[in-house]
Amino acid sequence: MQLRYFIVIVASILFYSCGEGIAPEPVKQTGFSGTVTFIGNWPEGVTRTHIVVFKDPLLSSGDFNAFNLKFVSVEIPYGTTVFEYNSADTAVIKINEGEYSYVAVAQQKTPNVSLLRKDWYVVGVYYAEGDTTKPGKLIIPKNTLVKNINIKCDFDNPPPQPPL
């Protein structure tokens, strides 16, 4: 009789205490997410549109280079009005934790992909806390998905362009 109670108690403890105790830890994403909103008519002849992130500010045309470029999104389809993204899901070049000085949406009209500054036109810039006087810094801590990195692209009122 005591053995029967013992088995019931042990079975009950095991049954009720196994609530995912050995389940894997949830995957922690490192990156950023947000929404890109396009206002106005898309320019004719655009061949590609991407979200791009640069580590250092673009103070000269020389800063627009492959070593400074730290993230490139998948292509945003022509004519899109709203593009929601998560860098973990939409990366051509994945981003790591760190501090980044320039987050923008840029377009190109050349038939082939080019890394020359003259071939890209910035149509939207990330500004922190609504301060449109300078690009916002993106700070991504390790194992953190930074949310609400939203960019407005107004084709009738484009942002200042980085140096050519």
PLM region spans:
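A short, amphipathic beta-strand motif
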Residues: 30-38, 51
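Membrane-proximal, proline-rich intrinsically disordered regions
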Residues: 22-28
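Sec-dependent signal peptide recognition
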Residues: 2-9
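C-terminal motif of bacterial Sec signal peptides marking the signal peptidase cleavage site
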Residues: 14-17
